[in-house]
């Protein structure tokens, strides 16, 4: 631990240094998202070869996919404690180390049971990253760029997906699924190196009573010393509330409202159904008439590129367009896309589809993913990091992140079962209905938080304002 004295805390910094530090923090922490994206993408391409190698049933295929989410849900339960004890920085370090171990274990698995166990370890690592990185970024960013910095995390997720799809396509010619899974260890090592140079979160430092260090970090990140001191004072005011976590959740209705809203948001994100496209894209395109592995992987890569470019656009629009408009438009686009995709797949099931419907299926999949990438994918993480009161932020985000992974596990573990029971059309139309419902929930319940400080949101929440008004 580096001790920063008062003199260093008063050292002036140039605007260029401030911008460089903000960029470094954003990119370094967002590498955690890259790891998440790599694991999402790599299993889509590796699963057909793993299925052939171990002769897997549909149920075991679902477990190979969803075991990562199971581990993430388990890891999320301990994230609050880990983040409070070690801080955001060293929580990221722990996640990166586990990611290396899980990747190597997956690559050298000699049985499906060993593979599932290794993917549970990967899941714990991903769960730590998905909790800690958005939280860290929200606490490091000023209110006018907070959405952009957290969206950088989602952009890195999509970049990871695209890189995984590219890697899968390259290795698909030889069917080397072990190389597909083992290559994930490389960016995890990069994250370990980058985390060494990251500063601790000023809010975590203040919570530990290390106010001089907290001010020094804020001075590294804010345009002026006055802004740094003003923000530190706001943090101190927020910390005057003594109770925290579970104790505060039990006795304070407003805290419960924030926690339940975060859980609802994460469930909504997952039950859009978009991650089943990421996990099972080759299978979906096989149902859509693409018969060869090469055709399926190329179509999958196109979807990944769509995800990445749409997320890139979202990075520069989320702080301008606002959270609520993005969600309402995104859910509407996903509802339309899944509706038409279900129709296309029904024609293939009936044997009445033309070749043009194959490409329409790809187009609808791209539309769904673009809608997701520009709305629920980044915005839900942004909102969940913004709405929790500081004194119980670890607890609140632990609850919402756990909900994300449990919901993620459910959709991953039920997709093939749904296909067998209600068909491809019924499966995607189920997600159409859910997305329509989410438009209404967004309109009536979700707050707009753009360009608002975390402390302002907390004051409105604790004053008992309606949830949709806490950002006003």
From Swiss-Prot:
Residues exposed to the Cytoplasmic side: 1-29, 85-91, 136-154, 200-257, 319-325, 383-404, 447-472
Pfam families according to UniProt: Sugar_tr
Subcellular location as annotated: Cell inner membrane
Any one GO cellular component localisation term in the record: membrane
Keywords, comma-separated and alphabetical: Cell inner membrane, Cell membrane, Membrane, Sugar transport, Symport, Transmembrane, Transmembrane helix, Transport
Membrane topology reported for the UniProt record: Multi-pass membrane protein
Disulfide-bonded cysteines: none
Predominant location category: membrane
Keyword presence, Secreted: no
Induction or repression: Induced by arabinose. Transcription is dependent on the transcription factor AraC, the cAMP receptor protein (CRP) and cAMP.
Similarity-based family: Belongs to the major facilitator superfamily. Sugar transporter (TC 2.A.1.1) family.
NCBIfam families: SP (TIGR00879)
Function: Uptake of L-arabinose across the cytoplasmic membrane with the concomitant transport of protons into the cell (symport system). D-fucose, a nonmetabolizable analog of L-arabinose, is also a good substrate.
Protein name: Arabinose-proton symporter
Biological source species: Escherichia coli (strain K12)
Name of the gene encoding the protein in the UniProt record: araE
């Amino acid at each position: 631990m580096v001790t920063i004295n008062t003199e260093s805390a008063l050292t002036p910094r140039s605007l260029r240094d401030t911008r460089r530090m903000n960029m470094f923090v954003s990119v370094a922490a967002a590498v955690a998202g890259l790891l998440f994206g790599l694991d999402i993408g790599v299993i889509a391409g590796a699963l057909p070869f793993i299925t052939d190698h171990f002769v897997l049933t549909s149920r075991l295929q679902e477990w190979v996919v969803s075991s990562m989410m199971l581990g993430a849900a388990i890891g999320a339960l301990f994230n609050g404690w880990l983040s409070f004890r070690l801080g955001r920085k060293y929580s990221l370090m722990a996640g990166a180390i586990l990611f290396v171990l899980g990747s190597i274990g997956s690559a050298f698995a000699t049985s499906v049971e060993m593979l599932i166990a290794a993917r549970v370890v990967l899941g714990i690592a991903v769960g730590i990253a998905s909790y800690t990185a958005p939280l860290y970024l929200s606490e490091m960013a000023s209110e006018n760029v907070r959405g952009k910095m957290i969206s950088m995390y989602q952009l890195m997720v999509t970049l990871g997906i695209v890189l995984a799809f590219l890697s899968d396509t390259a290795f698909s010619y030889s069917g080397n699924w072990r190389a597909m899974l083992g290559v994930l260890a490389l960016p995890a090592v990069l994250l370990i190196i980058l985390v060494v140079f990251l500063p601790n979160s000023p809010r975590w430092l203040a919570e530990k009573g290390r106010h001089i260090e907290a001010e020094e970090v804020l001075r590294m990140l804010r345009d002026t010393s006055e802004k740094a001191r003003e923000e530190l004072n706001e943090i101190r005011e927020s910390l005057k509330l003594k109770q925290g976590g579970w104790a505060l959740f039990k006795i304070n209705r407003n805290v419960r409202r924030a926690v339940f809203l975060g859980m609802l948001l994460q469930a909504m994100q997952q039950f859009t159904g978009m991650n089943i496209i990421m996990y099972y894209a080759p299978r979906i395109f096989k149902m859509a008439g693409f018969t060869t592995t090469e055709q399926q992987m190329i179509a999958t890569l196109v979807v990944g590129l769509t995800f990445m470019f749409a997320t890139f656009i979202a990075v520069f629009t989320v702080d301008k367009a606002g959270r609520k408009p993005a969600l309402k438009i995104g859910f509407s686009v996903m509802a339309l896309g899944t509706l038409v995709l279900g129709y296309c797949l029904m024609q293939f099931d009936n044997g009445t589809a033309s070749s043009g419907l194959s490409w329409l299926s790809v187009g609808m999949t791209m539309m769904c993913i673009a809608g997701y990438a520009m709305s629920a994918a980044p915005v839900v993480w942004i909102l969940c990091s913004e709405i929790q009161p500081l004194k119980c932020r670890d607890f609140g985000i632990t609850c919402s992140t756990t909900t994300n992974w449990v919901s993620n596990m459910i959709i991953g573990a039920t997709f093939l079962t749904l296909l067998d029971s209600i068909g491809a059309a019924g499966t995607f139309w189920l997600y159409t209905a859910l997305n329509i419902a989410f438009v209404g929930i967004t309109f009536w319940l979700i707050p707009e938080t753009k360009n608002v400080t975390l402390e302002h949101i907390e004051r409105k929440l604790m004053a008992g304002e309606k949830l949709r008004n806490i950002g006003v």
